[in-house]
Each structure stands twice: as structure tokens, then as C-alpha cells.
């Protein structure tokens, strides 16, 4: 039924996927009283660089969004973009990716004193976020007795396995193990986001052989810039998070 609201919503998303933004916006504007359509419209405006329109719409409807818990995650992300980290991390707790079904008998950590307790931290995000936010386990280590960090098998080799009071695990290696507390990596940030780290303060393993290899290939007298040009093809916000590698030809050919 073309008048069915889910059909109309899917039609708008289809137009966005096909980069037919004019027709998508027309549908979204017509149904912006529906919060689902409203969120997509605001997001689309931001992604198109129409920040003024996006911010006007967001600010006019923020009170409406606050009343609907289904969109707290979106509010959290927007607050984080705006630099309001306290509210941002508070609302981010309502994200859909938050793991709740692992080690069900283990208490969720919510800031209690754990200096003589063990705690396990679960990865829940993409590989990049797992690497980026893993440094906050260094803060957690300072206030706990033992920290275990569960990461995907495909990147376990990237982490230092000889850190004091931090164990790197996978879902397979924690079977039959018990912990006093658990927390997801995304939730850890609300406790430690103000902490500062030096560039070499992280959980990563330095592969000196690989470093030496690339130092020989690259001109060390010039700046070195890394470009992440593609996210997971099945990840959120695709195709907006990726660009064709060919489109970087001119940049990559610069001397």
C-alpha cells in the first residue's frame, strides 16, 4: 500500500540511497511531524552541508525529541557533535549497539568503587572505535584491581598483551570466567572522557619491524598523512562514510 507510512518512509530512504535528495526531502518535509521522518531529514541536511537548516529544525524540535526515548541515542550523538559531552554521553547510553545480553549474571558497573574488584569491558563498536577508545582502559586500570578487555579476534594481535592489570580477551577466552563487574566500551567514556592522554599512552602493540619498513619507504622529511577512505560496506551511514579510492588520485599524486 503506497499510503502505508512504512512504505513512504522506505521510499524516502531509497531516494537517499540513490542520491535523489530533492524527492527524499519533499517526502521527509511532508511527514516531519513523524519523529522518524524528522530525524532522517535533520541528518540529511547535515550530510548535505545544509547546517543552518539542520540546526534550525533540530533546535525547534529538540523538546519533542527529548520526550521520545526511541531517539535518545540520536540526541546523544548530536550533543556530542555540539561539544556538550555531559549530556551527550548521558543520552548515548540509549544506543542500539549497547550490549546487554553478555554475562547476564554479572553486575553492570555504574561508577562504584572497584579498587579490589575485577571488571570486564566489551567492545561493541566498529574496529576503529575499538582501537580509538581502548585507551580509556588505562584510566579504568587506575581504580580497579583487574581489567579484561574483550575485542574481536581479527584485531587481537594489535593490542599489547603485557600490560599491568589489563588482559586482552576474546568472546572465546572468557568462557567460564567470572568478573565482579562488566561495562561496554561505549559506556566507559562517560566516566573518563575528560582524561588526557599522551600520544604514546595506549594499549597498542608497536610493531617495530613494520615501522622500520615504512620508514624506509616514506620520506621522513615530509609530513605523513593517513587517509581512511572506506568504512564497512555494511556499516551505518553508508554510502556517506566512504569515497571511491580513484577520487583521491590527485591527493595521492602530490609530492
Residue ranges and their predicted role:
Residues 6-255:
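Catalytic machinery of carbohydrate-active enzymes
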Residues 1-2:
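A detector of tandem-repeat and repeat-rich interaction/domain scaffolds
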Amino acid at each position: 500500500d503506497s499510503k502505508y507510512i512504512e512504505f513512504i518512509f522506505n521510499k524516502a530512504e531509497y531516494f537517499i540511497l540513490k542520491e535523489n535528495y530533492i524527492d527524499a526531502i519533499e517526502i521527509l518535509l511532508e511527514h516531519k511531524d513523524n519523529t522518524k521522518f524528522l530525524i532522517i531529514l535533520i541528518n540529511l541536511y547535515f550530510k548535505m552541508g545544509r547546517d543552518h537548516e539542520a540546526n534550525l529544525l533540530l533546535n525547534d524540535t529538540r523538546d519533542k525529541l527529548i520526550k521520545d526515548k526511541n531517539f535518545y541515542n540520536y540526541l546523544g550523538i548530536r550533543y556530542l557533535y555540539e561539544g556538550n559531552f555531559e549530556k551527550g554521553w548521558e543520552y548515548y547510553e540509549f544506543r542500539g549497539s549497547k550490549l546487554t545480553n553478555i554475562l547476564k549474571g554479572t553486575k553492570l558497573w555504574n561508577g562504584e568503587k572497584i579498587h579490589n574488584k575485577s571488571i570486564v569491558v566489551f567492545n561493541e563498536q566498529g574496529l576503529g572505535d575499538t582501537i580509538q577508545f581502548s585507551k580509556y582502559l588505562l584510566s579504568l586500570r587506575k581504580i580497579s584491581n583487574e581489567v579484561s578487555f574483550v575485542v574481536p579476534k581479527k584485531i587481537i594481535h594489535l593490542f599489547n598483551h603485557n600490560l599491568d592489570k589489563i588482559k586482552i580477551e576474546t568472546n572465546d577466552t572468557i568462557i567460564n570466567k567470572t568478573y565482579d563487574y562488566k561495562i561496554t566500551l561505549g559506556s566507559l567514556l562517560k566516566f573518563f572522557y575528560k582524561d588526557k592522554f599522551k600520544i604514546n599512552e595506549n594499549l597498542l602493540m608497536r610493531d617495530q619491524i613494520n615501522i622500520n619498513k615504512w620508514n624506509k619507504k616514506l620520506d621522513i622529511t615530509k609530513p605523513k598523512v593517513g587517509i581512511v577512505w572506506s568504512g564497512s560496506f555494511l556499516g551505518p551511514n553508508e554510502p556517506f562514510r566512504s569515497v571511491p579510492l580513484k577520487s583521491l588520485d590527485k591527493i595521492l599524486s602530490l609530492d
